[in-house]
Amino acid sequence: MNYLVAMEAAWLVRDVDDIDDAIGVAVSEAGKRLNEAEMDYVEVEVGATGCPACGEPFDSAFIAADTALVGLVLEMDVFNAESPEHAQRIAKSEIGGALRDVPLKVVEVFETEADEDEAEAEA
């Protein structure tokens, strides 16, 4: 089975004054580290947090003392996994290897369609 695994990462950015700068730096640094590990197939986006008062989503970023904590969402397709749990372990191992010392948490796993070549091979 094929799965899309979405993970949340907590990215620390130092010496920033602005939320938008912190988000840009976090996405850029994460993308750079993934590309250096030849993992350009991992999607990197800023996460969203729901407002406790109105429920409206806003960017997951917070600045205190010129240091930002940015919540990133990392998505990776995992092919030929035996189960959703197996897909989670594969994704966490792959991404965790490239992003050492970055806290990761699996937030969702979706089963995806097999592409046409795989569907024909299984038939």
Curated annotation (Swiss-Prot):
Pfam short name (any one): DUF555
Highest taxon in the source lineage: Archaea
PANTHER family in the record: UPF0212 PROTEIN MJ0068, UPF0212 PROTEIN TK1194
Family according to the record: Belongs to the UPF0212 family.
Name listed for the protein in its UniProt record: UPF0212 protein rrnAC0441
